[in-house]
Amino acid sequence: MRVGPLHGWSERFAALPDGVQIVAEPFVAMSDVRIDPAESGPLAAHLGVALPTTPNTWVQGDTTTVIWLGPDEWLVTSPFTTPEELESGLRAAVGGAGAVVDVSAQRTTLSLRGEHVRDVLATGCSLDLHPRVFGAGSAAQTTLGLAGVVLLALDGTGTHYEVLVRSSFARYLATWLLDAASE
């Protein structure tokens, strides 16, 4: 049986105060893609969505999320497929024009929702998370607590975020979030 880094934490998350909900989403398939954006047409066709080229943004395809990490680097995630299927499909689309690496085991995903979740994040993140600045479609590689994360804004109201944290830091970050939410 596969066990994610936050296996057994659902009861702790369920005990959070009203206004903050955290759900661990383990085993999301993730691949890092490096390609010149000018050569990304076949990849975009495969994904069903153009790669975001505006820094610190993400886009949603039918079954994948594509996160801008750099001028020629994206993180492609999908909870709907296996890491092997995601990587092989991306490799076929990229061909010799770029590189694809499976990084699924590197990170785990946390979904954070609620009217106070932005306040919780703000206690440990130096970014301005107000929806006018960090609204739906925004993404950033940043620090939350002392953990490096990829942070996605999933709505325009500041009440739904996704946090991708290195698996080895997942328990630290979960403990930090529980503490920050109880303040």
Enumerate the predicted regions with their spans.
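Basic, glycine/lysine-rich polyanion-binding surfaces/domains
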Residues: 1-183
